[in-house]
Amino acid sequence: MPSLKDLKNRIGSVKNTRKITKAMQMVAAAKLRRAQDSAEAARPYAERMGAVIASLASGQGAGAPRLLAGNGRDQIHLLVVMTSERGLCGGFNSTIVRLARQRANELVAQGKTVKILTVGKKGREQLKRDWASAFVGHVDLSDVRRLGYSNAQGIAREVLAAFEAGEADVVTIFYNRFQSVISQVPTAQQVIPAKFEAAETNALYDYEPSEEAILADLLPRGVATQIFTALLENAASEQGARMSAMDNATRNAGDMINKLTIQYNRSRQAAITKELIEIISGAEAL
């Protein structure tokens, strides 16, 4: 049975831990609001960009750009896995890594070649355990205080270069789509060959200089926009998951403090009772 001193030290230690988790929860809540606003603001632009590209793509025939039609092969798959740079965010990283592992295993079973590009240290650490030979690169965002379109452009340049060089036939990004503080949806989205959903409209458009020229210019931007949207969704999901995880940790610390305090009071009461009995017994002996 632990001594009163041990119990008191443990209560103090858990209280200090609770202060830390509470502070982290508050920081995550502040960051979540900014990240959520950025993700929600980017969605309409990405949807409109996709609708325009889909409208242009619908009129393309055999001469469609390679980014849209593909290169005629389906052998080399590049998986871009987006996770966080830091931990303490519950199952945020493990869920997306699990989805990427599942897809990679399915592709290997089909005889495909899998390559992996990670964004975020935590995904790199987990995937390198059993997919080290498939790694082709890593994007470090640890020094980025606020995600910008330039971050997405850098990743887009890498995957576009791999596609143009024949080093990747299909590119799929893996990220957590933000729904709420307690709900982040692991998502796999193919970006090359490009897939965009057409908007439901009866409007007819005239394009200048030509549909082909505009499409050739928009497709690389569309890939970068999809990656940027995924980065923002992932960032909001990370802060939501961290806020939820730290809230749970704070609650658990409070429960543990209550239990330890009860145990401390009972032990202290037992010690006092024992001392009283010894005093009374000594007095009776006299």
Swiss-Prot record:
Classification via NCBIfam families: ATPsyn_F1gamma, PRK05621.1-4
- Provide the protein's localization: Cell inner membrane
Q: How does it sit in the membrane?
A: Peripheral membrane protein
Protein species of origin: Fuscovulum blasticum (Rhodobacter blasticus)
This chain's function reads:
Produces ATP from ADP in the presence of a proton gradient across the membrane. The gamma chain is believed to be important in regulating ATPase activity and the flow of protons through the CF(0) complex.
What protein does this entry describe? ATP synthase gamma chain
The entry assigns this protein to a family as follows: Belongs to the ATPase gamma chain family.
- Mind telling me which GO cellular component terms the entry cites? plasma membrane; proton-transporting ATP synthase complex
Membrane found in the keyword field:
yes
What GO MF annotations does this protein's record show? ATP binding; proton-transporting ATP synthase activity, rotational mechanism
- Report the gene name: atpG
Q: Name one GO biological process term.
A: proton motive force-driven plasma membrane ATP synthesis
Note the superkingdom of the native organism. Bacteria
Quaternary structure and interacting proteins, as annotated: F-type ATPases have 2 components, CF(1) - the catalytic core - and CF(0) - the membrane proton channel. CF(1) has five subunits: alpha(3), beta(3), gamma(1), delta(1), epsilon(1). CF(0) has three main subunits: a, b and c.
Q: Which keywords describe this protein according to UniProt?
A: ATP synthesis, Cell inner membrane, Cell membrane, CF(1), Hydrogen ion transport, Ion transport, Membrane, Transport
Q: Which InterPro entries match?
A: ATP_synth_F1_ATPase_gsu, ATP_synth_F1_gsu, ATP_synth_F1_gsu_CS
